[in-house]
Amino acid sequence: MLACLYTSFEHSNSVYTECSRTSLNQKSVLYPGGDNMKLQEKNYATAALNFERPQDALKLALLKLKENQWDNTMQALIDIVHISRLQPELIDSIMPIVNRSICSLLRNIRSNVVRTACQVAAELFRTMQCTQRPEFDELVGMLLQKTGDMNRCIRQDANSALDTMADFIPASHCVRVMSTSRGAGHKNPLVRATVSRLLNYIVTLKGVDTLFSTTATKDTRGRVFIMCAKFLVDGNCETRANARSLVKLLMTHSDFEHLFHQDVDRKLTEKIQKQLITLKYDAPSGSRIISK
């Protein structure tokens, strides 16, 4: 029975020969991942399989994970994805192990292994929505790092996984990891551009009013403001453009100015004061995302 599951993995190898042909500068605001998700759908085209005994399939997958061999780990994670779609409650208790295994594949030197790890991460963000720390933080940090990879296909898959994270994981968890040195403080400009794009997308998706609505979002709002302020003076033009777009969106709320100056360091606000004034009196426009 398990042999038939591995045929889905063998079938998926063909999709590694080329990336999505969609231009990286033509992603929509509503779904920045664009056509990248088509690759993932092909990769799990045969995922809708029924297990007669999913518990036994899970035990076998765990044994493969313990072997700590990249090929067995990859096959085990694909099986776990299948199980998570049928009986996600079986996977809950082992998600820390699963996320650590995904991270181990993300460190692999083989591009097809890394791409599979990105796609597995995306599927588990969708089905499990697990935010247990520190494994969740480690996984998101590694996916962010892969958005700066030299391999274009890996960049696309990592971005698609992060798009799925933004769709299914609470904003507070996403923003917390993105605000660290693995995200907004990363030395790679491509990673910072990804963070600015995701930040724009998350605020657009959740709504500006939600960000300003309750005291429960105070920490998240503060992180968003600080990242916006730093991105306005970033050395990367895409990062700056995304930050300007996001600040203009945030300025539509009546409490923005008061709360922004309350949460952001005074020296930083003075540094970007001219830009804030320009954005405030600039002609209003929709949120525009410079994509990966």
Show where each model-derived region lies.
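Extended, low-complexity, acidic/polar intrinsically disordered regions
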Residues: M1-K292
